[in-house]
Swiss-Prot record:
PANTHER family, per database record: RIBOSOMAL PROTEIN S9, SMALL RIBOSOMAL SUBUNIT PROTEIN US9M
GO MF term (any one): structural constituent of ribosome
Entry annotated with the keyword Ribonucleoprotein: yes
Protein name: Small ribosomal subunit protein uS9
Alphabetical list of HAMAP family matching this protein: Ribosomal_uS9_B (MF_00532_B)
Superkingdom assignment: Bacteria
Record keywords, A-Z: Ribonucleoprotein, Ribosomal protein
One GO biological process term: translation
Assigned protein family: Belongs to the universal ribosomal protein uS9 family.
One annotated Gene Ontology cellular component of this protein: cytosolic small ribosomal subunit
PROSITE patterns hit by this protein: RIBOSOMAL_S9 (PS00360)
Amino acid sequence: MAESINSLEELGTVAKTEAAAPVHVQKLDAQGRAYATGKRKDAVARVWVKPGTGKITVNDKEFEKYFARPVLQMILQQPIVASNRAGQFDIVATVAGGGLSGQAGAVRHGISKALTYYEPGLRTVLKKGGFLTRDSRVVERKKYGKAKARRSFQFSKR
């Protein structure tokens, strides 16, 4: 590549053509739904988003029944509220693994990704809110010679 460029103008044109931003296009399946997977801790959620009345179903239950704590319900609705799309999409999710908090985070991550697949214009809003970033924090492993990951066994001088 270095041999083919003879002037600074040519270098500028080559740099412009290579630095084109990726274009995000709508990704839908045969039924007109957007599909995405979300992860958090040990939980994995599979999420489908389609236009509808705002009904959210998690593991064949209404999300208010599956996630009884209001904090978890709020976590689930954050990407929808941030993108001003409340009541416009029906969301179906199946989630497995982990506890309720991790599952709520996984469904939130999946909803965010599926919304961007359905409506690519929402990507900037959801990215700014931090909903598209996979939370990589997981439980630290237990080490041998220790009671837990970092806690030592009780020490007795005598």
